[in-house]
Amino acid sequence: MDIENNLQDLKKKFSDVERNLENPTNLSQKEFVSFSKEYSELRPIIEIIDEYNILKEEISDLEEIMKDENSDGDIKELAKEELLEKQKIVLPKVKAKLKLALLPKDEDDSRNAILEIRAGTGGEEAALFAAMLFRMYQKYAERRNWKFEPISISNTGIGGYKEASALINGTEVFARLKFESGVHRVQRVPETESSGRLHTSAATVAILPEVEEVDFEIEEKDLRIDVYRSSGPGGQSVNTTDSAVRVTHLPTGIVVIQQDEKSQHKNKAKALKVLRARLYEIERQKKEMERSTMRKSQIGSGDRSERIRTYNFPQSRITDHRINLTSHRLEQIIKEGELDEFIEALISRNEAERLTGGGNVTF
């Protein structure tokens, strides 16, 4: 794709969208929403295009000064310095920004996300770690002014979580959290360990884009839905009605159990939401595998079996193994959800990879 040949088309398209939004009374609600979405997507690109065009004009003016035989020597010298800076430093940066803005976006980046955490190897210590991660993401959601709504939590006897899930609503939730999927490992001395030995435990994190029924339909014939009485720790019944729901997707064998709500209807709705997200993620992974044959991602595929991060408590250290980034702010990250140091680094690495792989976008 020749960028120069597409910039004017994009500016014209943006002008058309602006013109339509200036007269919203002429639009249906659906058209207004569509144009508004298009406007918000195009505006940041147009701003970079304008920056690029202004820079080209400035470079052209400086080149004219250099060519002008009547220009003063001192002025020419200043123009030469400024021209070199703009050509060698400023222009490549603006081109990189523009190239990145024009690369195809992940269509799921704007979606909300479903967080799923499962305790892995390590017994009760792994369950405690899973609960800690769940609270860490809850704190991070609060920092971002996102809504964090627990869907289901399977408790253990001493405060750990065997499994936990939550729906996170807000701006660009999936875009910021999608690189958190994988195996998280903890190294620490358990409070229950009398000998003071260091234990290694793990928990699996999955970040799934939330999808609505209209976006991803599940055939009714592919589902088996069972209802039963919900139970608490130890198996004792906590409800006198059949409110718990188990949904089985027959083609894949995926099972989702939901019993946190007192209403069977609400439990079924939540279970179907989680199932829809899991099935959609399977399709996403298939597409990602196809893309990865063309581009190998250094920050990982989002495979849940991939060990991505280690939390070392004795050294107050967190290391992300995909980008070799280490932070010694373990307590702030775990307790306050100060994850942006890692999330921003992962997003930057992903952008760099996309730029490297975007060879079909040229100036």
Curated annotation (Swiss-Prot):
It is found in: Cytoplasm. Keywords: Cytoplasm, Methylation, Protein biosynthesis. Residues 286-305 are annotated as: Disordered. Methylated by PrmC. Methylation increases the termination efficiency of RF1. The modification N5-methylglutamine is found at Q236. The keyword Cytoplasm applies. GO terms for molecular function: translation release factor activity, codon specific. The keyword Repressor does not apply. Pfam families: PCRF, RF-1. GO terms for cellular component: cytoplasm. Belongs to the prokaryotic/mitochondrial release factor family. Peptide chain release factor 1 directs the termination of translation in response to the peptide chain termination codons UAG and UAA. This is Peptide chain release factor 1. It comes from Wolbachia pipientis subsp. Culex pipiens (strain wPip).
